[in-house]
């Protein structure tokens, strides 16, 4: 079977050194570090108190209030990046067979913040199991892919890839193969995480997987240093 040629037609991002492709590339070229002291929560009692956080992102500016009830932070990032990518590709959705456009999106932990908030809310109560109806939809790792498809009406292949730190790479490989093999004409692919939260930092700290050079965040990451 002859395999189809695959090209990248649009890109988008939101990350610790840029909330758009233009800002990201500019800061990347200038050697800007995204590492700093954690601001998402009080990390003073943690062994590692530094992280690379997304900065200057206000979801209320991007999404309507009723939408935010449905989106964990990792899904918010996914929608921001995917929207920029679709716009960058200059797609004319009225001339595209939406049944041939899919989404393969990755997330290693999905909506861990949602899970943490709901469980802590229950634990701090009187034992009555009162959980938000959005708990499960916000938490599971494949909802970001679903939200992207719902926004644009894409009806092609749609699923999430979870393979730890390789999740996004695997998602992009899957997306490429779906096009090469004729299963889809276009795929929105990538990955998103929102891991700077208490259980994630606490868990990785207990594994000694995070730097404790808290006095020098910009130079703390040195994976090959003894």
Positions of predicted regions on the chain:
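Generic hydrophobic secondary-structure packing signal
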Residues: 23, 74-81, 167, 171
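Generic anion/oxyanion-binding catalytic loop in active/binding sites
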Residues: 13, 71, 161
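ACP-dependent fatty acid/polyketide chain-elongation machinery
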Residues: 1-67
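Structured loops at beta-to-helix junctions and adjacent beta-edge loops in soluble globular domains
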Residues: 11, 106-108
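A glycine- and small-residue-enriched flexible loop/hinge segment at structural boundaries
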Residues: 40-91, 141-155
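Acyl-thioester C-C bond-transforming condensing/cleaving domain
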Residues: 2-3, 19, 30-38, 87-99, ...
